[in-house]
Amino acid sequence: MFISFEGTEGVGKSTLIATLQQALIELGFDVVLTREPGGTPLAEKIRDLLLQPDQESMSVQTELLLLYAARAQHLSHVILPALAQGKIVLCDRFVDASLAYQHGGRQMPREDIDLLTQQFVAKLPDLTFWLDAPVEVGMQRAKNRGALDRFEQEKMDFFGRVREVYAQIAREDAQRVLRIDATQSAEHIAQVALTHVTAKLKY
């Protein structure tokens, strides 16, 4: 099973993923924890290029192509092999993030992103948890973590557009995407997620 976790900055994805990973291991499942951009040595180098704020200005086209280069490497070297071995893959962000951030945030044409997905993404998640919180709540949490990366330094209206596209994706693909109110306690969020995962694993 392939599970992705989505949301704007500071919504608690990392906490949920770590908790869910431990719960699934305790239930006897073999779990692979990974992230985007990143997940392989090469893809992590691309991640560094994408997130470092102190570099030359990056065009939106360059940003998008770097993301999909990292994703292609990640899929072929980590996600697809793990799924072929019957493992559960927990991935911090996947293709929905490209729609939300590059189409919503950067306002790139959706068809450009859809085309790359069709060409280079051989597998979509079986289940996606969208952790949703007001932008100001998430950004305050992100600031409390310390130095902000290149995306976290964007303006509030950027993240407002990102959130709107996540909501649109959830409406369009309600069978796959589950919205979770990220202002709830971490314990409650983890229980909701675990309940949905275990129910899906039974079928």
Where are these regions (language model features)?
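Walker A (P-loop) ATP-phosphate-binding motif of ABC ATPase nucleotide-binding domains
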Residues: 2
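Hydrophobic anchor at the beta1->P-loop junction of P-loop NTPases
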Residues: 5
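Walker A (P-loop) phosphate-binding loop of P-loop NTPases
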Residues: 10
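Conserved lysine of the Walker
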Residues: 13
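Hydrophobic positions on the alpha1 helix immediately C-terminal to the Walker A/P-loop
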Residues: 16
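NTP-dependent small-molecule kinase module
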Residues: 19-21, 136-203
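ATP-dependent small-molecule kinase phosphotransfer cores
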Residues: 29-121
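A glycine- and Lys/Arg-enriched "phosphate-lid" helix/loop adjacent to the NTP-binding pocket
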Residues: 93, 97-164
